[in-house]
């Protein structure tokens, strides 16, 4: 499978299975770039029976000839990152291809403490943060008081940069939240140590990407979370603090939009959400339990049980529009194997009126009632299917319905966690932009 410059995004609320799809596409990539988010995201990859859980490091690290860049739009927790590197080394995985943007911002210990304290203070108004300090890190970045990776490489610079923010954060911790202040010298020494270990990976990300582009290398941009968690385009305020949408790749990696050739969206065959916020197709009772257990719907980062519901075609169409999707990868089709009936949300009812768009107000979204189309289930295993024609007719009908509903081709179908449990319907990079699986 040849590759151009491609963005892979989540078309729902995250946890769509982007890690597996990125892993599949990374085989042909020269460079993989993570462009936003931090350790609040997580992806699981199964390789030769080994389960590898990564939060910050791109899936492409599993390919020794691939350069993996953590871009300036990310926020880096160096302690977690080094833990991931140690895990990869313990699994005999070469990490020499890892590159870390010198301008990426760093999650400091006070960010994590403030994240948890602020969420606790919100009470019933909590937003469902992972508690990893992501929001406070991005807030400091916007307020121009953040610490960057490059600051960890020079002791005097780190001391100068940290003096004001640490004093301010300690006052907040102690006087507002009643938390013991941090020892500034201990923080400095700890983070200088992280900088020393990471220094060999630190680069000017923009120069590295444009050098690769000039050399006509294939570049894969990997987003974290999903479209409905985007700070500007998601279910605000129940969102993340960055831009997972495809446009975020330009800002978070430092490239112009003309460098991007294709955008691939990843969506589950049903829908999940972690944390708070409206979720029109959410299920309860035995159906919810069935999806949770069969789909292993527990967060990679937090371990929290994910909320499960039927496929929502309204937010799917919205994701197609916001990201300019060229094609879709549908994951976890096998999780629906035992269902006798499957429902798909095709529209909402809002205050007695049928609407077919995603409302920008979360209050309006919370009042939306799903309007479903009911489809026949296939009630047999799809896990061993390797070609489209191997799928039962009802499964084919379901995929065709999703493609028509979202008005975008389905190029990849995933039927399990392993690499080989995948049907590549057509080349997701160079395939025609047509209605796939049409009659």
Swiss-Prot record:
Q: Which cofactor does it need?
A: Mg(2+)
Q: Report the InterPro entries cross-referenced here.
A: Adenylosuccin_syn_GTP-bd, Adenylosuccin_syn_Lys_AS, Adenylosuccinate_synth_dom1, Adenylosuccinate_synth_dom2, Adenylosuccinate_synth_dom3, Adenylosuccinate_synthetase, P-loop_NTPase
Cofactor: binding details: Binds 1 Mg(2+) ion per subunit.
Give the pathway annotation. Purine metabolism; AMP biosynthesis via de novo pathway; AMP from IMP: step 1/2
Q: Which GO terms describe its cellular component?
A: cytoplasm
Enumerate the residues binding Mg(2+): 15, 42
**Quick one: which residues bind IMP?**
15-18, 40-43, 130, 144, 225, 240, 304
**Catalytic reaction annotation:** IMP + L-aspartate + GTP = N(6)-(1,2-dicarboxyethyl)-AMP + GDP + phosphate + 2 H(+)
Q: Give the GO terms filed under biological process for this record.
A: 'de novo' AMP biosynthetic process; IMP metabolic process
List keywords of the entry alphabetically: Cytoplasm, GTP-binding, Ligase, Magnesium, Metal-binding, Nucleotide-binding, Purine biosynthesis
Q: Which domain of life is it from?
A: Bacteria
Give the residues the record marks as binding substrate: 300-306
Is the keyword Signal assigned to this protein?
no
Spell out the SUPFAM superfamilies in the cross-references. P-loop containing nucleoside triphosphate hydrolases (SSF52540)
Catalytic residues (positions): 15, 43
Protein EC: 6.3.4.4
Q: Which GO terms describe its molecular function?
A: adenylosuccinate synthase activity; GTP binding; magnesium ion binding
Tell me the compartments it is located in: Cytoplasm
Q: Which Pfam families match?
A: Adenylsucc_synt (PF00709)
Residues that, per the record, bind GTP: 14-20, 42-44, 306, 332-334, 414-416
Write down the top EC class of this protein.
ligase
Family designation: Belongs to the adenylosuccinate synthetase family.
- What this chain does, per the record? Plays an important role in the de novo pathway of purine nucleotide biosynthesis. Catalyzes the first committed step in the biosynthesis of AMP from IMP.
Q: How does it assemble?
A: Homodimer.
Name of this protein: Adenylosuccinate synthetase
The organism encoding this protein is Synechococcus sp. (strain CC9902)
């Amino acid at each position: 499978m040849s590759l151009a410059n491609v963005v892979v995004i989540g078309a729902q609320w995250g946890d769509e299975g982007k890690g597996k799809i990125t892993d599949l596409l990374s085989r042909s990539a020269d460079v993989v770039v993570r462009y936003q988010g931090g350790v609040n995201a997580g992806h699981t990859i199964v390789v030769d029976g080994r389960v590898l859980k990564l939060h910050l490091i791109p899936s492409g690290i599993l390919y020794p000839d691939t350069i993996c860049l953590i871009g300036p739009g990310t926020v880096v927790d160096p302690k977690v990152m080094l833990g991931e590197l140690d895990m990869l080394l313990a699994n005999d995985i070469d990490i020499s291809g890892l590159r870390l943007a010198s301008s990426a911002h760093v999650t400091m210990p006070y960010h994590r403490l403030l994240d948890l304290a602020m969420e606790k203070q919100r009470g019933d108004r909590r937003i469902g943060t992972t508690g990893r300090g992501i929001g406070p890190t991005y807030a400091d970045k916007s307020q121009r008081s953040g610490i960057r990776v490059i600051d960890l490489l020079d002791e005097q610079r780190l001391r100068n940069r940290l003096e004001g923010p640490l004093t301010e954060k300690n006052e907040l911790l102690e006087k507002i939240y009643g938390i013991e202040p941090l020892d500034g010298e201990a923080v400095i020494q700890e983070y200088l140590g992280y900088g020393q270990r990471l220094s060999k990976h630190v680069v000017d990300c923009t120069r590295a990407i444009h050098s690769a582009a000039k050399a006509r290398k294939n570049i894969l941009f990997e987003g974290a979370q999903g479209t409905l968690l985007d700070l500007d385009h998601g279910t605000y305020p129940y969102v993340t603090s960055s831009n997972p949408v495809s446009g975020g790749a330009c800002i978070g990696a430092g490239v112009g939009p003309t460098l991007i050739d294709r955008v691939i969206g990843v969506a589950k065959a049903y829908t999940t959400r972690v944390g708070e916020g409206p979720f029109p197709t959410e299920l309860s009772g035995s159906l919810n339990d069935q999806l949770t257990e069969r789909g292993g719907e527990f967060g990679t980062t937090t371990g929290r049980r994910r909320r499960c519901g039927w496929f929502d075609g309204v937010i799917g169409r919205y994701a197609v529009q916001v990201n300019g999707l060229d094609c879709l990868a549908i994951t976890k089709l096998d999780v629906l194997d035992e269902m006798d009936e499957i429902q798909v949300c095709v529209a909402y009812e809002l205050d007695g009126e049928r609407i077919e768009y995603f409302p920008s107000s979360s209050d309006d979204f919370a009042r939306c009632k799903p309007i479903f189309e009911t489809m026949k289930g296939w009630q047999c295993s799809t896990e061993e299917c390797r070609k489209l024609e191997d799928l039962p007719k009802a499964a084919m009908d379901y995929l065709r319905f999703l493609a028509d509903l979202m008005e975008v081709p389905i190029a990849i179908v995933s039927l399990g966690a392993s690499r080989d449990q995948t049907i590549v319907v057509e080349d997701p990079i160079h395939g025609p932009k047509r209605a796939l699986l049409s009659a």
